[in-house]
């Protein structure tokens, strides 16, 4: 082994434990954002036939939960916590069985079928004091005019609306409530 290779191996050996420790310290605290669903079996769209299986329902709810947990953490300051409880979810689009039997399980997205997400939330500071809380019915009448990415994401319109809500109700107050 030549001297350069030996030096490189030594440096990498010294850096690797530090990088691993740094990666561990970046891990987000999952308790900072709590997302729950109040009686999801009664939600407007979760009870629809096309996602009537528990697996289908859980997949949609899990995707919404994961989205909020990952996005909200980027807006929260150290020690702040966010609790979100969904009370209804009505996805963009609807079913049009009058189109024929082959369309019974196809969601048709038109501007008359707006997404609607109803939730309660509470943002608390590191000291435990409430910074912001409330009930919101999130909708966007112009959801079809947005450029929602990625276009292949079946929940792109709902995620856009949730992202707007997080920026307005969480990001601003989170910064103010140091």
Which residues fall in each region the model found?
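Surface-exposed short loop/turn segments
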Residues: 86-125
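Bacterial N-terminal signal peptides that target proteins for export
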Residues: 1-8
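Bacterial N-terminal signal peptides
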Residues: 9-17
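N-terminal post-signal-peptidase region of extra-cytosolic proteins
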Residues: 62-70, 101-108
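Short secondary-structure boundary motifs at beta->alpha junctions and helix caps
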Residues: 50, 132-164
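A short, structured loop/turn motif at beta-sheet edges
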Residues: 73-82, 122-132
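A structural "domain/chain start" motif
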Residues: 22-62, 80
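C-terminal/domain-edge helix-coil "capping" segments
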Residues: 64, 68, 149-178
């Amino acid at each position: 082994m030549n001297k350069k290779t030996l030096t490189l191996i030594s440096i990498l050996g010294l850096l690797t434990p530090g990088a691993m420790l740094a990666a561990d310290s970046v891990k987000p605290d999952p308790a900072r954002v709590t997302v729950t669903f109040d009686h999801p079996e009664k939600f407007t769209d979760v009870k629809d036939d096309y996602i009537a299986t528990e697996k289908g329902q859980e997949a949609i709810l899990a995707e919404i939960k994961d989205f909020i947990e990952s996005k909200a953490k980027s807006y929260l300051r150290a020690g702040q916590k966010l609790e979100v409880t969904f009370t209804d979810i009505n996805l963009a689009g609807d079913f049009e069985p009058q189109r024929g039997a082959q369309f019974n399980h196809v969601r048709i997205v038109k501007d008359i079928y707006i997404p609607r997400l109803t939730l309660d939330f509470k943002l608390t500071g590191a000291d435990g004091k409430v910074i912001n809380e409330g009930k919101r019915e999130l909708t966007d009448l112009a959801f079809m005019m947005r450029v929602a990415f990625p276009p292949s994401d079946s929940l792109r319109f709902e995620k856009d609306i949730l992202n707007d809500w997080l920026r307005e109700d969480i990001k601003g107050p989170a910064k103010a409530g140091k």
